[in-house]
Amino acid sequence: MSDDEDMMYDDDEYFDDDEDQDQNDSESEGVEIENQYYNSKGLIDESIPDAIKSYEKVVDLENGEKGEWGFKALKKITKLYFRIGDFDNMLESFKKFLPYTKSSASSNYIEKGINSVLDMVSSSNTIELDMIQKVFDLTLKSLLDTKNERVWFRTNLKLAKLLFEKAEYGRLAKILRDLHKSCELEDGTDDQKKGSQLVDIYALEIQMYTETKNNKKLKDLYKKALEIKSAIPHPRIMGIIRECGGKMHMAEKEWEKAHTDFFEAFKNYDEAGNSRRIQCLKYLVLACMLMLSTINPFDSTEAKPYKNDPDILAMTNLVMAYEKNDIYAFEKILKDNRKTIMDDPFIRMYIEDLLRNIRTQVLLKLLKPYTRIRISFISKELNIPSSDVESLLVSLILDNKIRGSIDQVNQQLELDTAKSSAYWKYTSIHKWANQIGQLNGGINNKLVS
């Protein structure tokens, strides 16, 4: 072997040794960082401040490389500061954590890490909303910088849901505008390719307008949400949209439309395994009674299994009393089941309508054999004050459901069915004759011209 060959061999051997040494050093550093991380974890139960310092050393050992262990350590530091209520330092450590999300780690891994922090602050009752908003704002800015649109959308949606739960409708409206903008084409119309995102936005917006009772906006959004065909929304989302639609129709006393929507909402919640199905079933029963349907809502295949559910049983009994026009039983069920019926603000809004319906049915049946009846007697039968009886009678007379008049002096209702029958027959014929006369006059005028 020549001297040159010897030299070449020695150089190669030296280079290989260096590579092995570098690899060993790297592995050694990796082991050291990993050990430091787990040592820090062991300090949490003993002393959180010491654990924080130990986790900070993990970050220092990475020498600015922003690796996996630094990502985990800063996430832990953020959570530990939160645990001890030091929210200012929590925010500072979170600021240091966010640049690690720009690393080569997978999007799912990053999203999981971010969500663990966001869920932590969102579910707390000890941290102020302004601080929570700062955490979200920092996250959203970081996600925009990295052009991670999918996670940005989901994070914004998470913030929007939180603001809805806290009834912060002003802040929520701004977030919803940003979300809408992200799903628009250049001409400002909805990008139908983003159907799933649009349905999520509409569902949240519909809930907001339901709570604020803005039926004008609600109608438009409800229609738009149902028109989206480019996505198959999660049944829970459709349950939300349909439930809000039912409430919208109830506000306008469109009982049949409300019944349809509540039934669809119930089915969707049931499919999703969502506990909201029970509440929607109650609303379905409510709408069914208000529309004076003769069909028992529990006769349907979907609702039948819940007929004897403890939370539904009171509504089942209410339907039975309602169908029998048993006022005393109806009122007793309401009184005995305040928690499952009357404590729901939405149901409570329509109890008077139900009572009016059942009182009307009992009253009309009560009046059949009489031509004259005392208001005090009706009051006793309906279990309401005489003043309420008078109001109900006036309303029914104006609606042409009762043909008679109230004698205020003797406090009685006088019915004149024979006269009324002839009167109404004459009125109908007279109205029909007038309409024919107007039509005939219009035709003659056209012929003359």
From Swiss-Prot:
Keywords: Cytoplasm, Nucleus, Signalosome
Gene3D superfamilies: 1.25.40.570
Pfam families (alphabetical): PCI (PF01399)
Entry-linked InterPro entries: 26S_Proteasome/COP9_Components (IPR050871), PCI_dom (IPR000717), WH_DNA-bd_sf (IPR036390)
Stored SMART domains: PAM (SM00753), PINT (SM00088)
Protein origin, superkingdom: Eukaryota
Record-level GO BP terms: protein deneddylation
Region listing for Disordered, in residue ranges: 1-32
Entry GO CC: COP9 signalosome; cytoplasm
Function: Essential component of the COP9 signalosome complex (CSN), a complex involved in various cellular and developmental processes. The CSN complex is an essential regulator of the ubiquitin (Ubl) conjugation pathway by mediating the deneddylation of the cullin subunits of E3 ligase complexes, leading to modify the Ubl ligase activity.
Record's protein name: COP9 signalosome complex subunit 2
Native species: Dictyostelium discoideum
Lineage, opening ranks: Eukaryota, Amoebozoa, Evosea, Eumycetozoa, Dictyostelia
